[in-house]
Regions:
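Conserved mixed alpha/beta core segments that line enzyme active sites in large multi-domain catalysts
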Residues: 1-59, 102, 111-210
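Conserved small/polar residues in nucleotide/adenosyl-binding loops
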Residues: 219-225
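A short, polar/charged loop-to-alpha-helix boundary motif
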Residues: 63-76
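Contiguous hydrophobic segments
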Residues: 119, 216-219
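Short, charged beta-turn/beta-strand-edge "cap" motif at the junction between a beta-strand
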Residues: 60-61, 214-217
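Active-site-adjacent segment of 2-oxoglutarate/Fe(II) JmjC oxygenases
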Residues: 74-120
Length: 229
């Protein structure tokens, strides 16, 4: 709803040096499917999304079909208070956020929620380990995928993620420095001393960067799927 340079004027508390956070998520994109309103301003409760969900109608219908049989120990008899999971008037981004929020609040990690909703194209990948294919097969059995151009960033509990749709139809770059991990649609969003950069690259189709705030070190997996930090 405003430009990046106006953010500190709208939220003056972020200019206070005592205001400290492990992460920040900022979204600045024009609205393609809905008219811009404050209620649809991103990031939402869990994620920010750049793209379009082409399977939105089917995803909403499937979620509505799942609702009568939803049970979870965390909510017990209060499960009906969560319904409808997706507001029928919600944008595609807001609907995806509601679905991911349901998953993380029912004890799934944010990386798991991402691969359940926006999985990789795995069926014919010979370079995938069997355990990884089995994981995606399980996810495919319990959750319909949300397909379409999608680059997402989000945070919940001890995790922050950035991930892509299975076709890689949106740009998503990352830069790893001595102190920070920065992901976004373009490289160069934040001025960084080149001497501080350890690694930079792109997040590929279906891939994900996942940061665990409780970890004391980072690990770059060699699998063609996930970069864990």
């Amino acid at each position: 709803m405003f430009l990046a340079e106006q953010l500190s004027n709208f939220y003056p508390d972020i200019q206070d040096k005592r205001f400290i956070s492990n992460f920040a998520v900022y979204h600045q994109r024009y609205s393609t499917n809905t008219f811009p309103t404050w209620s649809l301003a991103q990031p939402f409760r869990v994620i920010a999304h750049n793209g379009e969900i082409n399977t939105l109608k089917g995803n909403k219908n499937w979620m509505e079909a799942h609702e009568p049989r939803m049970i979870h120990a965390s909510y017990d008899k209060d499960i009906d208070d969560l319904k409808p999971i997706i507001d029928r008037t919600a944008s595609d981004s807001a609907a995806l956020d509601s679905t991911i929020e349901l998953l993380v609040r029912t004890k799934r990690s944010l990386p798991m929620a991402k691969l359940m909703t926006i999985p990789e194209a795995f069926a014919h990948r010979r370079d995938f380990p069997k355990k990884l294919k089995d994981l995606y097969t399980y996810a495919n059995a319990v959750m319909e995928s949300w397909d379409g151009p999608a680059a997402i960033c989000g945070c919940h509990d001890q995790w922050a993620i950035a991930g892509m749709d299975r076709n890689g139809l949106r740009p998503l770059r990352y830069t790893l420095t001595n102190d920070f991990l920065i992901t976004g649609s373009e490289t160069g969003m934040v001025e960084i001393d080149e001497a501080e950069i350890l690694e930079r690259g792109r997040v590929g189709p279906g891939q994900m960067i996942a940061v665990n705030f409780k970890a004391v070190s980072y690990t770059h997996l060699t699998l063609p799927t996930i970069l864990l930090v």
